[in-house]
Amino acid sequence: MELPIRLVVGLGNPGDKYTSTRHNIGSDWLDRLADAQRVSFALDIRFRGLCARIVQSDTDIWLLKPQTYMNASGMSVGAMCRYYKITPEQILVVHDELDLQPGIIKLKSGGGTGGHNGLKSIVADLSTQVFWRLRIGVGHPGDRNQVVDYVLHLPRREEAALIDEAIDHSIQVWPLIARGNFAAAMQQLHTRQEN
């Protein structure tokens, strides 16, 4: 058992035109968690983001959707961590992952940024790569020159269905993640996808 999660960050770009795009999958995931927990987001200018609070096992857990655009997400995350004295090991960042097929979700701690500007910004602000990531597969366009256009568009219908199903399953696994029972959470997330 590791430290419980105290901050969940859903990466995405602000504005209606980005809603449900591949790059906003993290933000969309956080909306689903907030709905399941029956909480609403409110803008908090201290953290440059939309925030909500849930309580799990007597622990306050903050939900944060940075409103800074992806490449400045670290400012929002860092501000909240400093204010609430949250360590990097207590953070879960939910983001789109080009290296995973739609419908695949992987949980891991640390690692590189894979070129993801939101992760780069968070790593730069926290001065560490050691935080938890929930990587939601969106697939790859096959040509790195098409990545920017690809992530800023909606997934195809069949991809969206796979992503939705995987998100639903990961929300069911959320209590394990929140408590810091990452081994059990990974087993449930990763084993299901191999079947």
Curated annotation (Swiss-Prot):
It catalyses: an N-acyl-L-alpha-aminoacyl-tRNA + H2O = an N-acyl-L-amino acid + a tRNA + H(+). The record marks N13 as: Discriminates between blocked and unblocked aminoacyl-tRNA. One of its GO terms (molecular function) is tRNA binding. GO terms for biological process: protein quality control for misfolded or incompletely synthesized proteins; rescue of stalled ribosome. It is an enzyme of class 3 (hydrolase). TRNA binds at Y18, Y69, N71, N117. Its EC number is 3.1.1.29. GO terms for cellular component: cytoplasm. The record marks D96 as: Stabilizes the basic form of H active site to accept a proton. Hydrolyzes ribosome-free peptidyl-tRNAs (with 1 or more amino acids incorporated), which drop off the ribosome during protein synthesis, or as a result of ribosome stalling. Belongs to the PTH family. HAMAP family: Pept_tRNA_hydro_bact. This is Peptidyl-tRNA hydrolase.
